[in-house]
Amino acid sequence: MQEQNPIVLMNFSGIYREEEFWKNRQVSWIELQDVCGTNCYCDEEAIAEINKRTENYPTAGIHFIDSGNYHYMTRLWLTRMDQPFCLLVYDNHTDMQPPAFGGILSCGGWIAAALEELENLKYVILVGPDEAAYEQVDENLKDRVIFLSREKLQVMNDEERNWFLRETVSEVSVSYTHLRAHETS
């Protein structure tokens, strides 16, 4: 494995060239703009190419994965986890929708795919989607999801939020947080 930085920028759309936050830091830059079949959905050929380009980068660290169109990248990174873990996700969406095109990996269904396919993923802590979105999640997945809705967050006081974090996140052995600089919904 080549020498790596703990910050990885995955460049799908070119947006990071316009950003400043990384320019005075040591980062690992993975160029992915030329990979076809990646926008919102990721087909098998694209998965193979992405895995090839990322294979020498560590799973640990901070991975900036471009916009929400590429959230499924977390699913690809998680395949490398060789010990049991739980996943912490802050998002406005559940990302547990059934795939619109067969079994193709998507930005809207990657959490469901991870829960169904990854043996080491024990459960997901999902913070942020609204109650209506969570009601649409497949019942078979809900037993492995700890959910905190946007509505509940708005009415919780500091003590309740701290309790939730102590009781759930304290058990997280590995957590991944989605950082979305350009997505507002």
What residue ranges belong to the model's regions?
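Active-site glycine-rich loop that binds ribose-phosphate moieties when present
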Residues: 103-116, 131-133, 147-170
